[in-house]
Amino acid sequence: MGLKLNELSPGVGAKKTAHRKGRGIGSGLGKTGGRGVKGQKSRSGSGVRRGFEGGQMPLFRRVPKFGFTSQMALTTAEVRLSELNKIDGDVVSVETLKAANIIRHDMKRARIILSGEITKAYTFKGVKVTKGAKAAIEAAGGTVEVTEGTEE
């Protein structure tokens, strides 16, 4: 039994037929076109805004506000040890991480976390390093230079 081009057809359910709304009773979507009868949702350009509950006090206003977003967290990037293998050279700083496209250019701080293997001895300057990552770095022969605000 060979495969013939003239016998090819798409699988069952692969092609759906288009719904032609408002084109007669037989289509199943005639007259009101699946919109029901009257009301705001049946009109063209209709719809209520997101979260609107018909005039009732909406959930997002019933629930109290809480917390805040730390701006420090928004400008601090987490870097895995395994990602450091992309860096040319032996010094790791925020600038070298940006140059190697490991962190975004709008990041001001970096934090090295223990995830993956480190294969080379690096010197870390001006970045935070977790305890586990520091142990792995020193085991690989690297050093971590502690500056103001980078100790964990």
From Swiss-Prot:
Region (Disordered) location: 1-54
Amino acid composition bias (Gly residues), ranges on this chain: 24-37
Molecular function via GO: rRNA binding; structural constituent of ribosome
Native species: Psychrobacter sp. (strain PRwf-1)
Gene3D superfamilies documented for this protein: 3.100.10.10
Record note on quaternary structure: Part of the 50S ribosomal subunit.
Protein family according to the UniProt entry: Belongs to the universal ribosomal protein uL15 family.
HAMAP family from the UniProt entry: Ribosomal_uL15
Pfam family, one: Ribosomal_L27A
Domain of life: Bacteria
InterPro entries: Ribosomal_uL15, Ribosomal_uL15/eL18, Ribosomal_uL15/eL18_sf, Ribosomal_uL15_bac-type
Protein name per its UniProtKB record: Large ribosomal subunit protein uL15
Keywords on record: Ribonucleoprotein, Ribosomal protein, RNA-binding, rRNA-binding
Signal peptide start-end: none
Function summary: Binds to the 23S rRNA.
One of the record's GO cellular component terms: cytosolic large ribosomal subunit
GO biological process, one term: translation
